[in-house]
Structure formats: structure tokens, C-alpha cells
Amino acid sequence: MKKETTLSVLIYIFGPVVRFIIVEELVAAAMDFAWNSCLQDMILRSAGSAHSLRIQTMWAFLRLLLSAGAGCLSVRKEALLEKDAFVTAQKQRRLLHKGYAAFGENFKARTMSLLLSAVILLALAINVLFSCIMPDLGSPQSFGNLPGIAGILLQAMLYCFFMPYVEETVFRGILYPRLQRGYGTRTAILGSAAFFGIYHGTLSQGIYALIMGLVFAAAYEAAGSFKVPFALHGACNLAVLLLQWTDTYKTFCKPLWAAVFTGTAVCGFFMINLIIKKTAE
């Protein structure tokens, strides 16, 4: 009986995440089959070899958009319920803990600015460290590239808005509060970050996602608002995209810059901690 109860709890916690991944993979597989079986030859033949790279990149973007979107829609009901329940619970907790006010109703612009800056610098530091120490693994974040203003806008919408929303909905919006209710806040932060890392697949992306997942989950816990991890996630992707667009990524791929980014990020997190403690007094 105990095993059945444990199994039902695990299904309740991880069921939506598994469903999201299954739907996402099925849609992606269907699009791959359609592309490889008939669409690739037909489209590339009519467009010409000069546009083949752009068309293949566009198809990759469309594949990501449709597969992730379908996966997100499959867990939409759970996401809405969990977000509302989590926000309500956090508001009740703030009545008992003044420290949460710094990230709640009395959230200051300077606190958000510090948090945003610190998280972006941490994201850049991890990317730079991987590029310096383990170049064979590649950058933790690597985005497809489309030329022109239209390509830039498409990338910005996909990687700075759409994908952060989808991933935060699944891993912070659903998985985190369910883990928290079952196993506590620390386990929820670690568990949601771990599954976020596993979801990203490769070693470099997995480690990067694990570290950033810890930050996003902690920010969600402290702020009690889905907007905060969503904004942080989008801002981190935008920072890496800006380096890619301006072709300055290689300039910063040096240990010195990694140390500068990391040190500044740590200072930012330290100042945020001081703000919370001061508010709690």
C-alpha cells in the first residue's frame, strides 16, 4: 500500500513534466519525418541552394516553436492551477516572515536591478568558463543564426520570450511547487534545477541549466511571482544573444572576464541578501 502511495505521489509530481517531454518529442519527431521524407527536397529545390542554410535554420526554429508549444499546451491546466496556488501560499508566508517583503509587495526597483544584473553576469561567467576550460564541449548556450532584422527579431522572440516562458512554466510553474509541497523548499529547488539540467541534454548545457535553475527556483521562492524567474531567464538568453549578434563573444572568452563576471555577480547576490536582512529587521 505504501508503494502505491509513493508511486501516486511521484506520478502527481512528475506526470506533467513527463507528458510535456513526450508531447514535445512526438511533435518534433513528426516534423523531422515530414521534413526528411518529402518537404526538404521539395522546398530546397524550389528555393535554390543559395537559400538552403536560411531555410533549414527557419525550419529548425519552426520545429522548436511547434514542439515546445504543443508540450506547453498539454500541461496548461496544471500550470495555471499551480501558479495561483503558489502565489497564494507565498502571500500567506510573507505575513509571518518580513524578509519576504523585500521580494513581495514592497519589491524595490533596486533589488530587481541587482538581481537581474547578478543573474546575467553569472550566466555570462558560466558560458565564458566553459568556452575557456572545456572548448570541446562547446558553449552552454548556442543559438541558431538568421541574418537581417527579421532574423534578429525572430530569435529574440523565440529565445528571450517563448522558450523561457515554456521552460519556466514546466520546471518552476509546475514541478517546483509540487516538489515543495511534498519534500520541502530545499529539495524542490535542487530537484527542479536537476531535472531542468537533465532536460537540456548535453553536458555543458546541463550544467549551465542546473546552476541557473537553482537561481531561478530560489528567485521564484523569494519573489512569489512567476514573472521574476521568467524575466531572469529571458534576460540571460538575451545577454548571450547580444554577444552573438555583435560578434564579441570571443573577446570575452578569457579566464579574466570569467573571474570579473563571477565576482561582480557574487557582490550583487551579497547586496540582495543585505537588503532582505535589513527589511526583516
Residue ranges with predicted function:
Residues 7-24, 67, 113-123, 191:
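Alpha-helical transmembrane segments
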Residues 166-191, 218-225:
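Membrane-interface helix/loop boundary segments of multi-pass membrane proteins
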Residues 16-88, 114, 259:
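Alpha-helical transmembrane segments in multi-pass membrane proteins
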Residues 185-200, 234:
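Small-polar-interrupted transmembrane alpha-helices in polytopic inner-membrane proteins
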Residues 76-84, 270-281:
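Membrane-interface capping segments at transmembrane-helix boundaries
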Residues 31, 35-54, 83-163, 176-177, ...:
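Juxtamembrane helix-loop-helix connectors linking adjacent transmembrane helices
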Residues 10, 14, 110-117, 153, ...:
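Hydrophobic alpha-helical transmembrane segments
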Residues 21-33, 193, 205-261:
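Functionally important transmembrane alpha-helices
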